Amino acid sequence: MAVDQLGVELYSIDSLGADPNLVGRVDTEGNGEQVTLTSDGVFAACDDAGAYFIPTGKFSGTGSSTRFAEDLTVDHIAVNNGIIALSLGAKGIALYDVTEPTAPVEKGIFPLGYTYKSQFWGEKLLVCSREGLQILAIEQ
């Protein structure tokens, strides 16, 4: 869970209806805005401090987090098959190859207008912007 100035917290829920148990908290630069959970860890959008990949082990004290897109304001993150789309507000979206999540590779910034959120839908990227819904094909 993104917890603004406190960074990112990870909880476990043992069964349906059970109370969540705090696994740990990772402090981030900037405000934790939104998180996307993957099998390897958590990608976190941290407003004007870019984005992070935080391996699951980091929440229990092992491993280290990877900060990237430090010079961008990241509001939302979508992940699919080793590609990550960062929603950047007025700058559009940025795409990164995160096949190796601890070493993201920038693929470009695409000015699509003011972008609020993006979501992968199959092999397409749906982008919600002031201009309306845009549907993009991502080629690797």
Task: Identify the role of each PLM range.
Residues M1-Q140:
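Feature marking well-ordered beta-strand scaffolds used for ligand recognition
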